[in-house]
Amino acid sequence: MASSMLSSAAVVTSPAQATMVAPFTGLKSSSAFPVTRKANNDITSIVSNGGRVSCMKVWPPVGKKKFETLSYLPDLTEVELGKEVDYLLRNKWIPCVEFELEHGFVYREHGSTPGYYDGRYWTMWKLPLFGCTDSAQVLKEVQECKTEYPNAFIRIIGFDNNRQVQCISFIAYKPPSFTGA
């Protein structure tokens, strides 16, 4: 029924047009594109991300325990800790103070499975600081924890309660008895 409704003008065909572009026949040989190469094999002349930059060692592989974020830096001062907590609060993360009395780093004691480490879970100091708006409140809690447990490692974590993940974690205090090995 639909075919009977077509007009005769719609069915008219036009003759094939001659194409203006030659059909694709594949890639041309490399001999058509002359390439000149530098004979200089000097590494400083190669374009790269850092060929002329003196490389620096970031992490010593032996004799230094790895803690949390920023663990490759020297210990943070009170002012630097305050700035990190301000960053945490600006991102609307919930600050929480945790401490560990024995091992302030991941270690392997109870399992040999790849990816399994002990020492990832620390004891929470009080409750997370829900509604905290000032870094001084968090640093006050760190100071109280330090007074209560002077031989404990203390860290500050930032928890995103929308995504339900820990977003940042860094060491706020290392005990004086810790030698760094």
From Swiss-Prot:
GO annotation terms (biological process): photorespiration; reductive pentose-phosphate cycle
A GO term for molecular function: ribulose-bisphosphate carboxylase activity
Lineage: Eukaryota, Viridiplantae, Streptophyta, Embryophyta, Tracheophyta
Domain of life where this protein originates: Eukaryota
Gene that encodes it: RBCS1
Protein name: Ribulose bisphosphate carboxylase small subunit, chloroplastic 1
Keywords: Calvin cycle, Carbon dioxide fixation, Chloroplast, Photorespiration, Photosynthesis, Plastid, Transit peptide
Entries under HAMAP family matching the protein: RuBisCO_S_bact
Known function: RuBisCO catalyzes two reactions: the carboxylation of D-ribulose 1,5-bisphosphate, the primary event in carbon dioxide fixation, as well as the oxidative fragmentation of the pentose substrate. Both reactions occur simultaneously and in competition at the same active site. Although the small subunit is not catalytic it is essential for maximal activity.
GO CC entries: chloroplast
Subunit and interaction comment: Heterohexadecamer of 8 large and 8 small subunits.
Subcellular location: Plastid, Chloroplast
Transit peptide: 1-54
